[in-house]
Each structure stands twice: as C-alpha cells, then as structure tokens.
Amino acid sequence: MSDTRRRVKVYTLNEDRQWDDRGTGHVSSTYVEELKGMSLLVRAESDGSLLLESKINPNTAYQKQQDTLIVWSEAENYDLALSFQEKAGCDEIWEKICQVQGKDPSVEVTQDLIDESEEERFEEMPETSHLIDLPTCELNKLEEIADLVTSVLSSPIRREKLALALENEGYIKKLLQLFQACENLENTEGLHHLYEIIRGILFLNKATLFEVMFSDECIMDVVGCLEYDPALAQPKRHREFLTKTAKFKEVIPITDSELRQKIHQTYRVQYIQDIILPTPSVFEENFLSTLTSFIFFNKVEIVSMLQEDEKFLSEVFAQLTDEATDDDKRRELVNFFKEFCAFSQTLQPQNRDAFFKTLAKLGILPALEIVMGMDDLQVRSAATDIFSYLVEFSPSMVREFVMQEAQQSDDDILLINVVIEQMICDTDPELGGAVQLMGLLRTLIDPENMLATTNKTEKSEFLNFFYNHCMHVLTAPLLTNTSEDKCEKDFFLKHYRYSWSFICTPSHSHSHSTPSSSISQDNIVGSNKNNTICPDNYQTAQLLALILELLTFCVEHHTYHIKNYIMNKDLLRRVLVLMNSKHTFLALCALRFMRRIIGLKDEFYNRYITKGNLFEPVINALLDNGTRYNLLNSAVIELFEFIRVEDIKSLTAHIVENFYKALESIEYVQTFKGLKTKYEQEKDRQNQKLNSVPSILRSNRFRRDAKALEEDEEMWFNEDEEEEGKAVVAPVEKPKPEDDFPDNYEKFMETKKAKESEDKENLPKRTSPGGFKFTFSHSASAANGTNSKSVVAQIPPATSNGSSSKTTNLPTSVTATKGSLVGLVDYPDDEEEDEEEESSPRKRPRLGS
C-alpha cells in the first residue's frame, strides 16, 4: 500500500458542478464477484475502508485528462474522478480500463458520448462517416471552418468527432498561425471568424484540447483571438492587460519552474473564464464544466505544492513579522497569504484542515495580530480577510489561541481586542469593515459552534475569558456615549485613537435651580432631549447599532454571563438613553435589546426592569412619536402586546400602576386596555384567595402581606442609611441565595450614586447619567403643564404649608423641592422626614391625569 504510483484522490461532482473530495487512498483493479466483473477499488490510506467500488462497464465512457486524471459518469448525474499522484499509476489503470473495453490505451476517451436520440441517428449514418473531414486550414476557408464548429455544438456525437479531428491533425496550432497572419494583414473579417472558431472549440469542453490551447506556446494567441468579438466596435485589449498591467509578484522567489508555470496558467485560464468569455446561457452552462474542473485541479495542485514547501512558507512568515520589513513588502506578503487562503477554498474539508493546521503551526495568528494593528489600510483589510477564512473554517482554533495568549499578554494586545478595536476604529463612513468584523466576533462567541468534551467545556472557558478580558472593550463606546463622565470619555478617546462627534453634549449644570413650587419645562417627560447625551453623529450611531446587535445576540445565547454584566453595568438603562437618538434605527436597536431581555420571561430581569423603572424611556419615546404610524410606534406596541399575550404579571402590574394614565388615551390598539384588564383580573384573583383564608391567618401577626414586607424593606434601608450615612440602592431587594443578582451590584450602585450626588445638591436628581424620570409634583398647575405628553403623578402633600414636602423611601423616591424624581437612590438628608412617610396613604405613587 506504500506504492505511490497507485495513490489517488477520489472526487465526485456535486449539484453546483464543483468537485467534492471523497478521500485519499490506493487504487487497484480486481475482479469482484458481487459485481460480476473487473472493478476499480480504492481503499482509504488512513484506515483501509472502501472509498470506491466501481465496476468497469464496457459501455461507460472513460476520459483521461492532464495525464493524471481519469473521469467518468456512473449515472445521469453522478460523475467520478480519480486524481493520481503519479502519471505512471494513471497509465497503468487506464490500460486496465481499455483492456476491459477492448480499446487502444493511446486514446483519451474510450467511448463516444451519445444520448438516445443521437443513437438512432448514429445507427442510420454510413460507416464511412466516423470522422469529420476538416477543411484545409487557409484564410479563405475560415468562414467554412467557423460554420462547421458552430454547427456541431448541438450534437454530442459530432462534438466528440470534431474534437478528435482537431486533436489528431494538430489543427489548433495551424489556426493560431492564421490568427497571426490575419492580425498582421488587419483582416478584420478573418479575425471575427477566428473568434467564433476558438470560442466554439472551448465549448467542445475537451480537456485534451484545453491542454494544447492553454500551453505557454498557445495561450496568448488564444486570448488574442477572443479579443475580436464581432459584437464589439473595437477589439478588447486583453493581451495588453495580461502582459503589462497584471504583474506576477514573487514575494519570495519560487524556484520550482513547474509551480511557477502552473500559477501563470491558472491565472490566465481564470481570466478567460471570468472576463473574456460571456456569461453562458442556461443552454450553455454545462459546455464549460471541463474548464471549471481544469481550473479547480490546478488550484488544488498549487496549494499542495506550496503547502509541502515548508521552507518557502517559513520564509514568508519570518519576513511578515520582521520589524525591518518595509511597508510595501509587507503589503505584498499579506496579499499573497490572502490569495493563498482564497485558493485553499477549493480544497475539501479534510485537506483544508491540514492546510490551516500547517498555517497555525507556522504562526499565522500571531502574525495577523501584528499586521491587523498596522496603520496601512490595505494591509489591515487583507489581514481581516485572512482572519475571516480562519474563523469560518475553525473558530475553535482561534478561541484556543486567544485563551492561551491571555495567560501571557495584557488585555490591550489580545487578538480579539485588536479585532474589536479595528471594528470601533473603522474609518469607512458606511463601516463596511466593521460589519465584517462584527460577523466574525459573532461567530467566535456563538455557543452553537463551541465544543464540549469530557475533560473541559469550551463554552464556559471561552465565555469566562471573553467577559473578563474583552467585553469592556466592546461596550466602551456604548458606555461612553451614554455617560456624563467626561473623564471616562477622554480616557476612551485617548486609549483607542479615534474621534467621534458628540452632537448632544451632557448638561452638567442648569442656569437656574428649580423652585419647590414649580417644575422646569426641561424636566417634564417628553421635553428632555437636550438633557440627554445622544450620539447623533451618523457614523457613531452605526457603530453603536453594531455593538447593540452583538449584545442582543449575547442576551439570547449567553444566559448568566450577560445577565451579570447587564446588572453590574446597569447596562439596560444606559442602552435606553439611545431611545433619544435622532436616528430611528439606533432607537430601534435599543428597543430590540430590551425586547430580547423581556422575551426571555426571566423574573430576575423583570425585577431589574421594574425596580429601575426602565419602561419610562420607552413610553417617553412612544409619546414623543405622537400620532406618527411608523416602525418605532409598531415596535413599542409589539413590546407591550408581548407582555399582555404572555401574561407577564410583574411587568403588567408595574406598567398599569405607574403608566396607565399616560397610555389610556391610546385606543387605536387594545393593548393597553388589555393590560389593564389582565391586571384587574389578577388583582381580583388575589383578593378572592385572601378572602378564602380564615381571618386569623390574614392578621399581620401570622401573615406578612406585601405592604408589611415593603415597610420592613424600607426599615432595613433606613437602618443602613443611619449606620453608614451613604446613598444606597433603595428599591432592590437584598439578594437571596436563590437569586442570581451579582454580589457587587449594590456596592457598584452605591459608589456610583454617591459620587453623582456630590455635584448635584441643587440640581434635579436623575437616576443615572443620561437617565430621566416621570416628574412628580404637589402642584396641580405642574400636573397640567404645557407639554401635553408629560406624565405627572399626583402625591398628596405631607404637610399643609409645604415646609417639609419631601417623601423618602418609596419604591420611587419623590423630591418635590428638587423638581425631579430619583429612582434608585435615597439621600441621607432625607432621613429626618421618615415619620412623614409613614403617614403617607400610598407606598407607590399613582399617575395623575
């Protein structure tokens, strides 16, 4: 079995007319009892399994191509090919086939290819007409030759006969000599005939003729003939392009003359197929199948020859990563690898596997890491294309590399972070490169293509790595654009070397403080677009949309990793700031992110949304949209309709209790009335359950109802305030063992809110940078403010003179003197009014009219 003469690759032709590699093995010709005849057997060299068992049928047409290929059809749509490593092995098997069929081994085709209709005509032909008589190859016979070649294309038998005649008489070379004569004489008519003749010969679809036409001696004259299309007023200049414009660049000198010749030939034949020949019609699409196969096998041979020359590849990698290599040389090296990887796509999976393993062993990923960070746009673009080939073929290989790299390098220079940086820094106004890189990142973080073995799980390991080392880089533009912290923004811009225009800048101060008896128009819901950072630069908005698309993908596929991240960063609140963008597509991306979260129907997320009052920006957007019937309107309505249909009780109660007054006027859909109905039905059910319990069990002594629990919760937060004197997260319940709430979320929010409260003593309190709240007031005039879209909850005044009008420790804290609502933070200076809170008739404010 070690005999390399018999070593072959087995190919089958698929529905797309592409050759599929079925494996490598050793071929033999033996008698098979079951098939009752001599058969070709191919056994795999890896495990000895049978790759092919094919009886040599006496009537099957076998073709020998390029000295090392044998091609035949076993059924109407089942073509097979054996590609031999050595010519001697091909000749040996060819003799066996010819022996069975009683043919001379010198022929290239053992049978005429005929169909049933042709068989009948063939039987009627006189025996003397086995070959076609070709006219003498002279200038005055060109029209006759052209008519003959054109006429045979519709008949498989006549095509075969003409091909044999052309091959036996060396006719093609004689025709090309006539072409040179016609061109010297400027014989336009003759040149037009030669175009038809050469085009017709290509459509004969014969490999033996292609070998003559595409030889170094003939190919440029063939291209010359194809320049003179009679349909064109002026001939094309294809030869000028191939000889002068198209330059063959040897990044490293290729010493193998056969390899160099094969590269030249493949490029020129591909040019003929793609550029010169017109797109074949539906009736001609199979005429060039052999030409496609010719190019395919050439590419396979080129990749194999280069792959086996490790000295050549090692030298390429050494120069690519050498700091002394000049920019022009490095650009050529990267373009070579790009072309090399493109050629590798002709290989079948097992061969591609070996190809990419060779590149990985030589260090392709560390080399890409270097070149992707370079300033040259062409180099970065080519490196991105190479990276895409690697990711598409084996994302696990890339993931394994970056996880090993993380143990030795800083986060800033990790390959994935370099990719994210390239995505963020894309200078293309349409972000073409960023879209491509986003797709690659999505493939890398997709759990569907991650492997699970008995010893380790790639999914958990890689996602832990990604969220620890890379997620902060991905979300940095989003957090920067929804933050009022200028220092954070400056750091990010400096760190990532790019410039964004922030059209809507943060408002850190107001020209006047809001009197306790009235509310500033700026603080009314629906009128706060000037107070919120919104990335209204189009390129920035596109980038944020891409980032949100990735984060939405994470919500769907990453469960607890993204859940912890959203809580730690209060990410949904930051994302919903983008509902204020003037770019509707960005507002829709933010809404889609929230919709995916709600679509999970996870009570953990639902608590986060209700306690943070995160429906408010969505409802603001709906009200600001007014009566316009557009995609934003439909998307918001669909969000609430989903909650109604799925009967998500906690969200339904929150929406009805806090926002129904603002939404009840929307009657063109029944969504909000439906939510109110669901809420009231659930409330009735709860009351019935309560009434069915004996009165002694309803006593607070034995049963703690929701109100009692809420009072205990407030007492717990009050105690924390008295002990620590700090702002704490008021509405969030203390984590229970069964909750998934992150341990450091409360500390994170404490620190964040305490820092913000220092500078905002006299300002309207806000729940988070860029956040905004429904405005509450004791003033009836404020409740009926000038903005018809404002939503104002009415809270009964705690005192008649208004001297002490603050209400603390509500699920949504109310501070009338400061003219704004604080959602998550209780301030220490509110402690003195705890007693007044106890006398308040309601714990959760209801929306007024």
Curated annotation (Swiss-Prot):
Q: Which organism is it from?
A: Homo sapiens
Protein name per its UniProtKB record = Serine/threonine-protein phosphatase 4 regulatory subunit 3B
Give residues where Phosphoserine occurs. Answer: 117, 695, 840
For region Disordered, the annotated ranges are: 714-849
Taxonomic lineage from the root: Eukaryota, Metazoa, Chordata, Craniata, Vertebrata
**Which family is this protein grouped under?**
Belongs to the SMEK family.
Complexes and interactors = Serine/threonine-protein phosphatase 4 (PP4) occurs in different assemblies of the catalytic and one or more regulatory subunits. Component of the PP4 complex PPP4C-PPP4R2-PPP4R3B.
Found, by tissue, as follows:
Moderately expressed in tissues and specific brain regions examined.
- Molecular-function annotations in GO: protein phosphatase activator activity
User: Acidic residues compositional bias: what residue ranges?
Assistant: 714-724, 827-838
